[in-house]
Amino acid sequence: MGIKSFMGKRAEPEKPAEVPMLVRDYMTEKLITFRENENIMDVVEKLIKHGISGGCVVNDRNELLGIISEGDCMKQISDSRYYNMPMTDLTVGKRMISNVETIDGNMNVLDAAKIFIEKRFRRFPIVENNQLVGQISQRDVLKAALRLKSHTWSY
């Protein structure tokens, strides 16, 4: 007669509850936004004051018109110096990127990570019903990954 184990059956590891990890759950909703007619130097001040690298450009109805970044401001400063032109009359509308790609707020945040890698953007606006509702950044995606703790990539 063989040896019997008295330990019993091993318990199955608990699976984490399935929680959808949507872009809307990690996006930033309180945004620093800019206006199309805003002066570039005012934008530079806001970027520095708030410690951000760029932001969305909206109209009075909060509709997305474009994105302005530190890089766009740097180009303007460089061009102004090169052509010896004052920067007082230069507006966001002249330097912003107006063909803006957005991400759906209902998209899985890990699918959004793939888009960040493919497009090489630092941020994506989220628009619903033609209204800017938020923005997701690479840092927001990293926060979602921390929540998973890399133990499993299922959610």
Language-model region placement:
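Tandem CBS (Cystathionine beta-synthase) repeat/Bateman regulatory domains
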Residues: 1-155
